[in-house]
Structure formats: C-alpha cells, structure tokens
Amino acid sequence: MTLLLFNILTVYTFTTIKNLQSDLLAGKTTCAQLVEESIKAIESKKHLNAFLEVFSDSAIAQAKLVDEKIKSKTAGKLAGVIIGLKDNICYKGHKVSCSSKILEGFESLYSSTVVERLLAQDAIIIGRLNCDEFAMGSSNENSAFGKVLNPLNEKTVPGGSSGGSAVAVAANLCHVTLGSDTGGSIRQPASFTGTVGLKPTYGRISRWGLIAYASSFDQIGPITKTVEDSALLLEIMAGKDEYDTTASQKEVGDYTTSLNDKKTFKIAYLKECVESNGLDTEVKKHTLDSLDKLKQSGHTVEGVDFPYLDFLVPTYYVLTTAEASSNLSRFDGVHFGYRSPNATDLESTYKKSRSEGFGKEVKRRIMLGTFVLSAGYYDAYYSKAQKVRNKIRQKTREILSQYDFIVTPSTPGTAFEFGKNSEDPIKMYLEDIFTVQANIVGCPAISVPNGIHSNGLPIGLQIMGRDFEEGNLLNLANQI
C-alpha cells in the first residue's frame, strides 16, 4: 500500500458533492488529502468489514491527476468524489469476486460502463465492497469473506445484498457508493443504515460490467447521504450504451436542476402494506405520519388496494432463481475462477468446483432455479410465475396511471440481529416483501430515511414511480 507523506491538519467533513466541489475550487482541501482520509477511515473501521480491498495505488494516482485538473479548471462534475464499488461491478485491472470463493482472485479484464462514466467525470474509485455472495441475500451474512457490521449497532445486520455499500456511506468511509438492486438490494440496506438508496428504472443505467444474478431484474444504482447526490450520480451514469441492448435509448433528464422545483403530486399508498401483520408498529406510524405531512404540504394522498402483496415474494424467488441457475452455470471451474484440487476428470471438475466454490445460499437458489425450469415443473412454477409477474405489472401500472407515486415502508422492520433469520430462508426472504415489487415491474424506486425507531435504528420510506420519471421521483424524495 502506498501512503501519502503529508499530515492532515483537519479532517474534511463531507456533506454533498456540490459543497465538495466548491471547497476543492476554494483550496480548502485536495483530492490527495481526501483519499488519504478515506484510506485512514477504512483502516480505523476495518472491523466493520465493509471493504474487501482498498485500491490505494490507483486511487492516489487518480487523485493527483484530478488535483492538476482542478488547478487548470478542467475537472469533471465528480472531481474529488471518492466512490466505492460493490464487489460485482467490474473495474479493469482490479479484482472482482462477487464475495464468492469461486471468483476469489479473479481480475476484471474491462471496466463496466458505469465505472467508465464515473472516471470520465474525474471520480476516484477507492475500493470494492463486501456483499452477499453473488448479490443473493438480505443481511450480508452470505459473503464468503465474512459478515458486514451495521455501524449504527454492530450487533445488527446492515441489510443486503449491498450491505458493504451502505455501511461505507453510513460510516463515512467514502463519499458515495454503487450497489446493485435485484429485489431491494440497494433500498433495504439504505433503510437499515439511514442512507438514500436509488433503484432506477430497468434499463436506465447500463448493466455492462455488472456480474449478473437475474438479468431481467438487476439494476445498478447509487447509495448516498442525500437525494441531491443520487440525482447527480444518476445523471452521469444513465443513458444508452452500445454494449447493453437492454439499456434504454430514452434521453437522460436534468435530474439535479429539477430537484427543487415546487411540485405537488398525487400519491397512493398500498393499504395491504400498511395493514400487514408483519409490519412493525413504529414503522407503520412513521409511514403514516410521513403520508400525513405530504398531504399537509399540498399533495393528494389516497389508499389503494393491491391484491397481489402475498404473491410478490414467491413470484420473485421463482423467477430470479431460474435466471440465476442459468447465469451462474458459467462458473464451472474450467473457464475462470476456482478449480477444485480434488477433481480427477472433467465431470468431477464441474461438480467439485461448484460444490466447493459456491456458498450455501447460492447453491440453494441454483437448485431451486434448476428445479422450476425442469421439464416436469416448468409449467407449474416458472410459466405460472411469469403470468403472475404480468398481473403484478398490470396492476402496478394501473395504479401509476392514476397516481404519480406509490409509497410503502422500505422494510417491515428495522435492522435485525445477526443469526435471527439466517436459519429460516422463508423468514429472510420476507424481508424483501415491499421492495421486490419495483424489480418485478421494472419501475424506479427510492428509499429515504424516515425517522428513528425507539430501538435507535433508522426507518426507511420507499417511493415507487413511473418508468423513466426519475426526475419526479427524486423531486418528491427530496421533499421528505
């Protein structure tokens, strides 16, 4: 590890990217100083296990380049912004493992589109962040490299699968991070750590360079301290991409400019969500209080029926495991990644490498996905789940044709203690009951902080919007 050779007189306090840019131009801090502070913060809070690796050398080199650009007034919109990457996003010349033994030591051969776009605006990539293995989990207990601790209460989980990304922001280890969201993997950890987590519309941000879990659900997004920073990052990362045919051709909005426009909206909340037996009473109260405040601010707020709540989680897990069983078939011990030393022939190489390389939860989902795609059960499970997905899409879009937004709690409760749900897969899966809807449908959704529970942990509020209307979504989120 390369260390800088100057002393920091005062540690810089990060608030927003906009303020950071002003302070860099005014000479109140430098990119080199910011990188050193970040490296020291990560080291001092190493026990949180948020970072799997710190890219010290490349970050320091980038900081020096950006400092020169600032002096010559040619720096980009993210000059000096220190960003952490979830360990399933590729950065050329750097390791990426999806927090799995099967990819341990694998080095990216190219950079993801999002990384290229961030670097083009002079961002500084500081390292890769721990997550649930192959983004499969809701607690960050499934990583092959150890669990991540919630800095707000180290006995509790940070959420998953982007737990390391949320913790890095909440614990001030870096300024902002990227995660991926397949069923709530950005929004749930954001809720558990008191940060802002944005899942854009499916296709708004290119998935090129994101190691796939479930291709029709996955979406990259930011975790930040403020809605303003999420808006700026989305503006920079969004847009068409020749390497990803699912990336939308739609024009990218000016999300930061429209953020503070005074707008009033028509908002729906799902009655079944706020009346759910599994919803914590304080989470319910905070949700209803926020809806009342929105009403008092001039917004129209009405409850609507959503009869498919109980079908969300089963539909999600049938379809995502099916896609995962296909996507993860490439990790076979032959092409790249872990190869079992105990294999004697090609067949045993496949079997032993996958059995030894994948963790318990990943193997569970691969087996479930293979089962629902098998000839005897395809119609009974996979085909039926696709039909239910269409029903959920139709109903959600019907609501969004009459209302601008759908508001729900982000999660049924606050961060839970380690081990509480890990032996009960169904109970763990139900942690995603409010977040999976946006991925099933493909619409954008954001989790914003919504007060503190009596147990001292943060509560999140989720807002879902119409496809590609992130400008309005961010505007409302900024009002809360």
Which ranges hold each PLM region?
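Short, conserved phosphate/pyrophosphate- and ester-handling motifs at nucleotide-, phospho-/glycolipid
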Residues: 27, 86, 226
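Short glycine/serine-rich loop/turn segments
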Residues: 79-220, 270-272, 322, 408-426
